[in-house]
């Protein structure tokens, strides 16, 4: 979940804007890349859904582990899409589903039983109707940690609370078996519904970015010229500093509390960092490795900046690659990496990632100036 302030950053334009045809090529390829990434996210989420429904139909330890495996696989795709946020697009505009898809951290007791309270959560409250509409209505009701939907609600159902510094949560599959844990039927129903809602929300993003439609977001975005390029840079710049470096790494470093991990139940936070960094690189270079193994390549921000300042484009490309490498160097479990003082190896790895992401956000602001974009509003940590 984003809880950050807006930081207006002004840069002097060093050159005139690039040719309109070059700008349009970048904007159109970006739109195609966004659509492809969301399309793959739906596909992988449906694979996860199939595994979850197979488990719910016949609960077993093997089926439970398969559902977890498919959640992790689907996150690899979704994490890259976070580079498309922060400019009021379909994902997080006024009516966007981001808070329903990926809100965190969540209060486990809002959903289900927790250590010390077997009756906690909406699952154990028979007065709460089990419908998609009700779950959506309850999301963030009464507090931003009252999360009832999305990736992390599903994650909590699959792993349960994490009490270990050395591993993930270890919810028993028998929580979903009648007679083994109270309200197992509601637990099954909840997991099925919250998974369907996630798939539906992701599909709405595919539709918003679908080609060939006259009245969706993509149709207007592709006509936006340099304003659309500004939005693209706001997205990757804000994810670089405000969200990934700030909210997702620095906050946990400061508190040294595993509750501030992004994916704390599954211990997948290290991969969240990598996929976010990969998403930024995808946008900058105009490349994307699809779920089927094919690779998209096209006009990119890097190409556009290189027409005005080749050295800056090269520098930014190098810095973004360094950030991805630093993120890949973060070890698991993340809740061990955040412990200790500044000299601890894990904290050094995290700080290296933060420093690189901070540097690349500055490069991106400079890159915007090089192509005639004089003002940006990036997200900064509070």
Q: Which residues make up each language-model segment?
A:
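Sec/Tat signal peptide C-region and signal peptidase I cleavage site
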Residues: 7-14
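Mature extracytoplasmic or organellar-lumen-exposed domains after removal of signal/transit peptides
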Residues: 16-382
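Bacterial N-terminal signal peptides
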Residues: 1-5
